[in-house]
């Protein structure tokens, strides 16, 4: 959690000066469903909350913060684990086709170009669903499916949606 906060703090200082920016924190479905254990789940819940609270503090500077739930990302390590022990993987991974490591970057790039990004600030979003909203596909042309029906949905919407500013 410390690295999320420290990196965001430094980025926010630069972005606030220029009165624009987007900070994206990568989280996951484990924010609402058991995945790898208490510490992992608690950390991801905290990531979502930090993105939300930062949105409130950074709104006057036109800096947006969001948390994205990525789901299964086919990193080299994930591919290796699936090849070695797919039968032992948790139910949280079963049934997911996964995305390339490039997919979230494509989604973040689309978000960064959105002139209305502040309307999403403070929200937690499923990367696959945001990809659909922006028309983003994976490097092989596939549409990545949301796992929300099986794994749950985010708790936090954008701060502007509820006009919530902690007052």
Enumerate the predicted regions with their spans:
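Residue-level detector of anion-binding/catalytic polar loops
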Residues: 64
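C-terminal helical subdomain
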Residues: 67, 87-167
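Hydrophobic positions on the long internal alpha-helix
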Residues: 3-11, 50-51, 111
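A glycine/serine/threonine-rich, flexible loop-to-helix segment
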Residues: 60, 69-98
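A short helix-coil junction within the Rossmann-fold of NAD(P)-dependent oxidoreductases
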Residues: 10-19, 114
């Amino acid at each position: 959690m410390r690295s999320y906060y420290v990196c965001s703090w430094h980025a926010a200082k630069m972005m606030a000066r220029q009165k624009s920016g987007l900070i994206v924190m990568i989280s996951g479905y484990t924010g609402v469903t058991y995945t790898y254990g208490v510490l992992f789940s608690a950390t991801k819940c905290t990531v979502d909350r930090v993105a939300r609270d930062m949105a409130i503090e950074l709104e006057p500077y036109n800096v947006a913060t969001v948390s994205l739930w990525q789901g299964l990302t086919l990193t080299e390590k994930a591919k290796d684990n699936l090849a070695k022990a797919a039968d032992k993987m948790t139910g949280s991974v079963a049934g997911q086709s996964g995305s390339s490591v490039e997919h979230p970057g494509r989604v973040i790039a689309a978000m960064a170009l959105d002139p209305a990004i502040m309307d999403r600030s403070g929200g937690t979003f499923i990367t696959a669903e945001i990809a659909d909203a922006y028309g983003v596909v994976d490097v092989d042309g596939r549409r990545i499916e949301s796992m929300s029906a099986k794994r749950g949905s985010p708790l936090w919407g954008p701060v502007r949606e509820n006009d919530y500013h902690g007052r």
